[in-house]
Amino acid sequence: MLKIYDTLTRSRREFIPLTPGKVKMYVCGMTVYDHCHLGHARVLVVFDSVVRWLQTLDYEVTYVRNITDIDDKIIRRALENHEPFGALTARYIQAMEEDAAALGIISPSFEPRATECIESMVTMIESLLSKGLAYVANNGDVFYDVRRFPGYGKLSGKSLDDLRAGERVEIDTNKRDPLDFVLWKAAKPDEPSWDSPWGKGRPGWHIECSAMSGHYLGERFDIHGGGQDLQFPHHENEIAQSEGVHGHPHVNYWMHNGFVRVDNEKMSKSLGNFFTVREVLARYQPEVVRFFIVRAHYRSPLNYSDAHLNDARNALERLYTALKNHAPSQAQAAEEATATIDWVNDGYAQRFMAAMNDDFNTPEAVAVLFDLASEANRTGNSHYASLLKALGGILGLLQQSPRQYLQHPAHPQNDHHSIEEIERMIQQRLQARKEKNFAQADALRQQLAEAGIILEDGPQGTTWRRQ
């Protein structure tokens, strides 16, 4: 029985989909004005893991992850760069897709762009106006009137008075209340705009997600996810918009992943500890970064540091080493490739399922992987290695060739030895040993060791891995 922590009710709830056997899920994606940072990577990996587990439970998942391709930040960056906003967003969408692919992210069922759904947004704003939940200001902007929505603040757990006291809101004389938020922004010179009943303009950020989720998933869907930073005001405002239009809750389970911290400090450009995914991938294999993310529970803070990434790299290496040392024969591998995981009788599989059904507890699931590796090392039984790979695959891990993974440079940007060069030196060492020139053979081994290359001599010959 799958249980999910629902942010709205602040409780673990049994997951019961609206339609048996099917799951509809929406996750807030990137605003594409820059490269993905570690916070984006966490959202991508966390909800990719959620989708993978739901599919493992035989649900048919419709997964929508939007792209915000029109926003104040995008417009400012395009003006700074003296380029069309469409060229800017196209470049960063391509970069995002490359980063997601590197991290092993399954493509969503739909990945709508805000600029493709303007008509749906206009229709939704018209409905809010007709219900008296929105108003057109003197400057042509359209605002949501938060005082007209009785449930405002229920996701963040705060009243309007609490929110007014705690929020730093810029004074806008066009608003009736400081917490009122914009649904439609009147056109300004040198900014992209679209036609609407209120004149040319562009949508506000919050209406984009309400319109896109409703367009692709309907008035009500199962799961809405995103980073903790979106809980207020973005998701609070989505509730006000969608419930305001439809008259009923539009999401059954709200999921939020925790913040990313860097060396126990908040990640920010002002502190100089801001890292893009590309900067991290220049130093670590993508699978190490994914493994680092799934080792932490999705709702817990994730503390990034070189020490933690190095620890994740070493831990993942132990799992791949177990796979390499205890790989099944070709015949066994072919047989086990068609076999399904025995969730009923296999104790390791049962523990893995219990962990994932407990609010996607990936740290406990990863612990099962290490127990399997230990059992494979203890018994030499390839069955445990096969199960290790199968369960790891559910988390998007351990699907590379163990030998290739272990031969990949630990820190790509610092790698000074190609595979061809390493193989050449190994052959030179083998030749030296044949000629009983053990001094030269030892010197070559030492030279490789100093470069972080570990040689392993065995009955089948010499293999190697990076330290």
Swiss-Prot record:
Binding site for Zn(2+): C28, C209, H234, E238
Coiled-coil parts of chain: none
Protein name, as recorded: Cysteine--tRNA ligase
Family assignment from sequence similarity: Belongs to the class-I aminoacyl-tRNA synthetase family.
Subunit and partners: Monomer.
Short sequence motif named 'HIGH' region, residue ranges: 30-40
Cofactor(s) listed in the protein's UniProt record: Zn(2+)
Main subcellular localisation: cytoplasm
Reaction equations catalysed: tRNA(Cys) + L-cysteine + ATP = L-cysteinyl-tRNA(Cys) + AMP + diphosphate
GO molecular function, one term: ATP binding
Cofactor note (record): Binds 1 zinc ion per subunit.
Superkingdom, taxonomy of origin: Bacteria
Gene Ontology BP term (one): cysteinyl-tRNA aminoacylation
One Gene Ontology cellular component: cytosol
Gene3D superfamilies, per database record: Cysteine-tRNA ligase, C-terminal anti-codon recognition domain, HUPs
UniProt-listed PANTHER family: CYSTEINE--TRNA LIGASE, CYTOPLASMIC (PTHR10890:SF3), CYSTEINYL-TRNA SYNTHETASE (PTHR10890)
Span of the annotated motif 'KMSKS' region: 266-270
Alphabetical UniProt keywords: Aminoacyl-tRNA synthetase, ATP-binding, Cytoplasm, Ligase, Metal-binding, Nucleotide-binding, Protein biosynthesis, Zinc
This enzyme's EC code(s): 6.1.1.16
Lineage: Bacteria, Pseudomonadati, Pseudomonadota, Betaproteobacteria, Nitrosomonadales
Residues annotated for ATP binding in this entry: K269
Subcellular location as annotated: Cytoplasm
